[in-house]
Amino acid sequence: MITLSHINHSYETEEGKLEVFNDLNALIEDDEFIFLTGKSGSGKTTLLKMLLNEITPDSGDIIVDGVNLRSLARRKKPYYRRSIGVLFQDFRLIPDVSVYDNLYAAILATGGSARDAEKKITYVLSMLGIDHLHKRHPQEISGGEKQKVCLARAVINHPKILLVDEPTGNLDPASSAEIMRLLDIIHRQKITIIMATHDQSVIENTDRRIIDLDNMNPEVCKHE
């Protein structure tokens, strides 16, 4: 379970202080799939970075499975980070190696075992229907395929939480729909998914819960 309790945060800009969150409160249950919505600058990416423990709010607490991130011991931070997968809008793949080697590198970078790498890679590529791409290099595949590989990398170690930041922003409608279908498959693996998006085609066709960050004290609500 994730609890956002009285989160306040602001940034200093040339024009002065920009308030991002003012007493933000929300509760996210285990295994939920929710959307973060709001206009540009509303704090969607900032909140994801807070959940990654990359940004500490000015005040308030973020509690994940009973652990307050504000007081997370330094030695435990790498273990916490390994429990989270991240999928961004842009394709952050190693360009000069194969899809397989991109996933292999991700396993080793997060402290995974080389001994189990082949089994993990085979499983996730098959689950996402992209096993035929394993020998291809990023420059040899389409944008939609690159995003699928990035998704495979994000879940290669079966994280407890998957943070997704505008994953359909650079994709055509068909590729966007395919990414959403694959996220549903991943969600069925008992992974909590928190997805930031301003894609109206996604928002308007969902019955999932939404946190609207345009409301400075949002309640988690259901799309009507």
Please identify what each model-predicted range represents:
Residues 137-141, 145:
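Conserved ABC ATPase signature
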Residues 52:
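Helix-to-loop junction immediately C-terminal to a conserved catalytic motif
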Residues 60-68:
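Conserved ABC transporter NBD signature motif
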Residues 97-105:
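Short coil-to-helix segment of the ABC ATPase nucleotide-binding domain corresponding to the Q-loop/switch region
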Residues 156-160:
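A short, proline-enriched helix->beta-strand linker immediately N-terminal to the Walker B motif
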Residues 151:
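Hydrophobic anchor residue at the start of the ABC signature
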